[in-house]
Amino acid sequence: MKIRFLLLIMLISYVSCTSDDKEEVLPRAYTILSLGDSYTIGQSVCETCHFPAQLKDSLVAKFPAADSFSLELIAQTGWTTTNLLNAVEGENLTNTYDLVTLLIGVNNQFQSKPFSLYEEEFPVLVAKAVELAKGDINNVVVVSIPDYAYTPFGQDYGYSPETSQEIDQYNNFASNYCNQNGITFVNITDITRQGLINTNLVSQDQLHPSELAYSLFVERLLPFAVEKIQ
C-alpha cells in the first residue's frame, strides 16, 4: 500500500513538473524582402504567381497556422544592378527581414552594360541584402539569372548562343562570389533553358517565365527558405 502511495506521489510530481516546463509558443510574424527585376515581380503572370509570392504561400503551408508571413518587393521590369541599388537606397527599409532574396543582372546583359559594372555592383547589392536581413548572411538567398534565349522572344530576335554564354558569365561570377562569402546561391537557369521544348514554362508574352516555371523555382528555393527562417 505504501509503495503504491509513493508511486502516485511521484507520478503527480512528474506531471506537475512537465506541465510547468512547457513554454507557451507564441505566433510569429515573418517578413520577406525580394529584390530584383521583371523576374521578381513576375512580368506577365498574376500577382500571386511570381516566385516570391509562391515562396511565401509555400512557407505559410509549412509553418504553424498561427504564424504569419508578409512579403515586400523592390523590383521593376528593366532594372539593372544600378537601378536596383538606387531604388534600395531610396527606400526607408529596416534591417529586420527574416529572409531576403536577390535576383538581378539580366538587364545588365541585355542592355550591353560593361561586365565590370556587374562585378562592381553585385557585391554591393549582396552586402545590402545581408544588412537588411538582420546582418545575417544565413538569411539571404541569391537566385541565378534565367536564360531568355530559350524563349520564342529570344529566338524571334535572333539571339545567338553568345546570349547564353554571357548569362553563364554573369551567373558564374555570382555563384563564385556567393560560395566564397558563405551566401546561399540557387541555380534555376536550367529550368528556363527548357522553354523551347516545354512551352508551358514561358508566359504569354513569350519572354518571361510562367507560373509553372516559377513553381519549379520555388521547389528549389523552399528547402533553403525553411531552414533559414526556422
Language-model features, listed with the residues they occupy:
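Short, flexible loop segments at the rims of nucleotide/cofactor-binding pockets, characterized by
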Residues: Q76-T80, T163
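Short hydrophobic "helix-edge" motifs at membrane interfaces and signal-peptide entry regions
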Residues: F5, P27-R28, T199-L201
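Serine-esterase "nucleophile elbow" of acetyl-processing enzymes
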Residues: T18-T77, E89-N95
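C-terminal motif of bacterial Sec signal peptides marking the signal peptidase cleavage site
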Residues: S13-S16
